[in-house]
Amino acid sequence: MSQQLQEIEKVLSSHKLSGDDYAHIKQILGREPNLVEIGIFSAMWSEHCSYKSSKVHLSGFPTKAPWVIQGPGENAGVIDIGGGYAAVFKMESHNHPSFIEPYQGAATGVGGIMRDVFTMGARPIANLNALRFGDVLKDNKTSAHQRYLVRGVVAGIGGYGNCMGVPTIGGETSFDECYNGNILVNAFTLGLAKSDEIFYGRADGIGNPVIYVGAKTGRDGLGGAVMSSDSFTEESKSLRPTVQVGDPFTEKLLLEACLELFKTDHVVGIQDMGAAGLTSSSFEMAGRSGSGMIMHLDRVPAREEGMTPYDFMLSESQERMLLCAKKGSEAEIIKIFEKWDLDAAVIGEVTATGNMELFWHGDKVAEVPVNPVSEEAPVLNRPMSRPAYLDKIASVTIDDFARVPNQEAFERLTKSMEVVDKSWIYTQYDSMVQTNTIKKGGMLDASVVRVKENGKALAMSADCNVRYCYIDPKGGAAAAVIESGRNVAMSGARPLAITDCLNFGNPENPEVMWQFGQSCLGIKEACSALTTPVIGGNVSLYNETNGVSVFPTPSIATVGVNDDQNKVLMSSFQGEGNTLYLVGESNSEFGGSLYMKEICGVVAGVLPEIDYEKELTLWDLVIEANKKGILECAKDASSGGVAIALAKMAAVSGLGCSARMLVNDERDIFAESMSRAIIEVKQENSASFESMAGVLQCQKLGTVGGDIVKINNVSMSMKELQDNYFNTFKRVIERDI
């Protein structure tokens, strides 16, 4: 083999490009590519940027509704919330960086998703997160490392969000051994904008200037997009230099400068520099517009000496934006950003060539056609194979295991890391900044912010039961959409749209691709049935270490609108003597349940039945009854069943309860049948509520009050329950410090 060929193979390998990719690149260019061009193709055709393995499965997602202003394909999705305002939101992953460097990985994940939102012209008003960690309970190195990761990720999220002045108002955190080698950090941001003042990532108008704004460019994050498109091995700690370093104070200045700029008429288009940095932002803007672009890389503000064109194109330095502006507005734009102590430089212009032409001190260092890179990346229809494990686990039931006394099961489940209060996490976040948050964490099934401008409230919830997704990828993904929507409805808001973050293992494994394909089918089915279109999202693949993939984890965040910000429904008990109802049909359904995991020690069984009509009827009941003012609180009965839902309601409120649930088996108080809620009403409203419940099963459970929680044959004092609920998490996570 010639030395030249060896060098080419070495370069291709380091850029995760195949021989076929190289041949395709030569065909596109009509010549051999240089290193800058190889870097561009590598980044833009990476799994992270191109979605080449997932795109074929994402087609067909429902994306339209009368209230959808912008669906997938932009920096974030946009829905009309009435009164001239729009909610702009998106969810993205920062999994690989957070495993390598938890603080910076999580922090820059938060920073990146906020830029996606404010680049659309919206001021961020709420953050959520969905976090998955491995086993934190054992006294071994793996669990100790997971506890370290929890502490680092939470500190990173809080450190960035708090400095930005954007409240982090909720989220979801769960633990499973499948995440020992790959934690998942999914960040969500929602912003508020006027519905007729949305900005898009376009580069229209031949001759219009292309302007770089924000922080200077360094070498941090080089190769980040490619790193996030590969699985981990024992050597992955060496990837620390590929993790970006964030500066929230600079991002705060960038936010305010952009919002000031948006009040002018200077902006044609604007794009965040996220994964693949200047490469992705420039190619995406030109690609959407069908235009070309010239950029002079020596004009890009540099933070380090000796940087090359390759470095400038692929750096993932944070807090940067690319603008396409109206010609003649350059000086005024630069003045705005300099006022905010930020860099701004005219680095190029829009052309009609359809090519990206890059110059370095007057010399052309790259010329690549835009469309084949941004819009025509390879699409892979990877082989799929149904995993053999599904047949083995489908027949497993709780009757295959020795019975555990219900009281013992109740005591163990109230200490489950999935159940217990996560205030150790959310008290590190500023949840009340901007003064729009309605109630602190743990008091609502959804997280809610008021919209002062129109008197409404926005409710949001991020959810995914990964055990459901493991035993039934299609049904589990549908269940994630359902539960996320149900939590929003339990707060009194009407669910309107979702964003997703699809976290899966290695797509080169046919079983993983089958899980992914089935999950997409489940999301399509649920969103269509519930009329909650997908308006944006993210795919994160290669969540695998040493051949072990994470469980399918399609995180779903639903956003809904409550027409009256004064009628937000709590999820904990509100008053002594109030009546409790269980709405919805209960069966002995334990597949993928918390009970099976914690008490039986397995993740197995058949998923509880899904009935979209019953689900929508439940949502309508809660939303309409809340409008009439006859509800005191509503809580989704899901993980851990009715018993654990009641325990949580009691722990948060400080009020006990006495409940009697009709069951076929005493363990059914822990069963997880879907489309159920626990409702609290005042006695004088009982008849009205029962009348409204209509066709739904409505069982009177009992009453609120007392200093114990009792349901059927289990009970616990409020003192013990609140100790379990509020202190367990801290005891576990701070064990090493």
Swiss-Prot record:
* Location relative to the cell: Cytoplasm
GO CC annotations on file? cytoplasm
What EC number(s) does the entry state? 6.3.5.3
Q: Which reaction does it catalyse?
A: N(2)-formyl-N(1)-(5-phospho-beta-D-ribosyl)glycinamide + L-glutamine + ATP + H2O = 2-formamido-N(1)-(5-O-phospho-beta-D-ribosyl)acetamidine + L-glutamate + ADP + phosphate + H(+)
Query: Is ATP-binding one of the keywords UniProt gives this record?
Result: yes
Which annotated residues bind Mg(2+) 2? 116, 272
Q: Does the keyword Glycoprotein apply?
A: no
Q: Which terms are listed as keywords in the entry?
A: ATP-binding, Cytoplasm, Ligase, Magnesium, Metal-binding, Nucleotide-binding, Purine biosynthesis
- Annotated residues that bind substrate are located at 93-96, 115, 244, 316-318, 540
Quote the record's binding site residues for ATP.
51, 90, 500, 537
- Annotated Mg(2+) 1 binding sites: 92, 538
Report the active site residues.
Answer: 48, 94
Among the GO biological process terms of this entry, one is: 'de novo' IMP biosynthetic process
Q: Where does the protein principally reside?
A: cytoplasm
Single Gene Ontology MF annotation: phosphoribosylformylglycinamidine synthase activity
Pathway participation: Purine metabolism; IMP biosynthesis via de novo pathway; 5-amino-1-(5-phospho-D-ribosyl)imidazole from N(2)-formyl-N(1)-(5-phospho-D-ribosyl)glycinamide: step 1/2
Query: What Pfam families would the database entry show?
Result: AIRS, AIRS_C, FGAR-AT_linker
Among HAMAP family, the record links this protein to: PurL_2
The free-text function statement in the UniProt record for this protein reads: Part of the phosphoribosylformylglycinamidine synthase complex involved in the purines biosynthetic pathway. Catalyzes the ATP-dependent conversion of formylglycinamide ribonucleotide (FGAR) and glutamine to yield formylglycinamidine ribonucleotide (FGAM) and glutamate. The FGAM synthase complex is composed of three subunits. PurQ produces an ammonia molecule by converting glutamine to glutamate. PurL transfers the ammonia molecule to FGAR to form FGAM in an ATP-dependent manner.
Assembly state and interactors? Monomer. Part of the FGAM synthase complex composed of 1 PurL, 1 PurQ and 2 PurS subunits.
What family does this chain come from, according to its entry? Belongs to the FGAMS family.
According to UniProt, the name of this protein is: Phosphoribosylformylglycinamidine synthase subunit PurL
- Organism placement in taxonomy: Bacteria, Pseudomonadati, Campylobacterota, Epsilonproteobacteria, Campylobacterales
The encoding gene is: purL
